Amino acid sequence: LKPTNGHFGKIVEFIKSVNPDIVGLIEVDFGSYRVERFNQAETIARELNHQVVCKSKYAEASMARKVPVLNKQGNAILTGLPIVARRYHFFNEGVKRLVIEVELQEVIVFLVHLSLKFRHRQYQLNDLHALIAGCDKPVIVAGDFNVLWGDRELQLFLAASGLTSANVRSQFSYPSRNPYRELDYIFHSPEIRSTGFQVPQIKLSDHAPLLWDFEIDDPKTDGLVLGNSAVVARPAGPSVPLTASVL
């Protein structure tokens, strides 16, 4: 495996330039030899002055936890907003099973990276719906959904959950050099209003980033209670991909 630090500085600068309130990182390196033992999630968090919520993407009993480099791959959510609660869930199917849940004062954020296998993805979407159904606040769900058969895979999940894609024009993000697939998504509850979305054509990783601006209204007062911005980017290496989501 080759080191992945070549674009890391540029990725950090890109994230800082967006000045996001919430950041999600998928398959970020927590300190393997290929990044010279430093924790990428903590490094980005320090640059943004954010808190970090992170965990290995593999379940405790997974063989991947015993494999060098893979055992340092995980997901993370960073935020400069007050955190009410943080929770880690693991799907029952697939190799990549982690779901990170971060509850903020006005919204709950989920970060996922779904399986490459169709059957496993469908089971994971069912589990994800069950998690969302138990929420009592507006929800944002973001990450790499790996829908290799297209967004038809997501229709039942979206219909059941009531979530909407922030990417209303279905702009492609993969591969970044010549995008022709929509694998990365940001979904949100109807209480959240999109005010802007774009896919910048930068090639710091194998996936192009997603940028999203949104607001949340308080139905009790008809007033704005939270204005925010979101990004999804992937600082991937050549062999073991990394994903960065800035939400």
Predicted regions mapped to residue ranges:
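Active-site flanking residues adjacent to catalytic metal/cofactor-binding acidic residues
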Residues: 26, 112, 142-144
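N-terminal, active-site-proximal structural segment of metallo-dependent hydrolase catalytic domains
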Residues: 1-47, 54-57, 62, 217-247
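Conserved catalytic cores of phosphodiester-cleaving nucleases, focusing on short active-site segments
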Residues: 107-111
